[in-house]
Amino acid sequence: MEHLRISVDIAGLWLRRRPEEKLDKEFTYAKLVELARKGDVAETRRIFDTPYARPTPTKIPAGHLFLDGLPRGSYQASLDLGTAVASFSQKGTTMLRAFLCMGRPVGVLMLPEAYRDAELTVERPSFGNGTQAAEAGNSVSPGSLQQLALPDANLETEDGMIGFFQKVDDRTAYTLLCKKCGTTLYYTAVQAENIEKASQLAKLELCAAEDMGADKLLQQHKRWWQQYWGKSSLQLPDETLEQLWYRANYFLAAGSEPGNAPMPLQGVWCADDDQLPPWKGDYHNDLNTQFTYCHYLTANHPEQGKVFLDYLWSLRPQAAKFARAFYGTAGECLPSVMDIDGGALGLSLIHISEPTRH
């Protein structure tokens, strides 16, 4: 291992920009039925499948951290579900502990004293500059991040902090900052409506984390998870199924913090390979989101379920608009495949043609 690469993401970080080519005016349920009766597959795909092939709107990654200075060789990674603390070890010796603070957008990396000289660097995703044309990708592999034209990031190297500030579009900017304090490394990724606000919030978060210190942050973090796991438990004769239940509840908590975007698919849905995320990281309003949240009441976690319900409730205007445009009727109905703002994205007919999926 030359260095440890850490992917950093923000649940609601999207490039919302819509292409100039809007959805066809015949993107309606009535037209879909008409074409189905005619057996016109080509026209059906043109109207309903083609929009999904465009690179935007899409979920985007926030960036990477690189940690250099640890011994070379093989490592073992593990996650303690009870405390939500990850460990990175070599030959039985823990080389790194990591956790994401519940309730605040701060990550903490804790090193042994012997590796206090390890170096941390930050890397922006490989967004494009507008020179690369859209690729002929598919829903699973939509193509390179180079298709996305984003302005250059502003670098930060002051007050012991390193990172960058990135404008995404007219509505969104974000900051990825980190700071090394001895054997502890703090990092944060914050989204806001402009660079100035994102920068201000990120610096406040890092300063507050440094003032509190890693040990107190870890105590606070463990206390939160202890209370969370104390609300329900499960014992099954099948250990694999039992672990599946606990993992599902871990994802439910980790991906459903109040005030943030809910999970589209069992957690943050993004790629870490300089590619657009599979299925654009979008919201499939079918079993994909239903299975993620359907158990929140039986597991006694209403606060996490409320994150998803509040999100859907906020999209009621878009739901009414889609009901009129697609079905030609009053009421409220969200697309079964949508962006973070509730806009229809298209996709294969199995996802958009059945009213019961919406």
Mark where each language-model region is.
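Aromatic-residue-lined binding/catalytic grooves and analogous aromatic/hydrophobic interfacial grooves
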Residues: 1-347
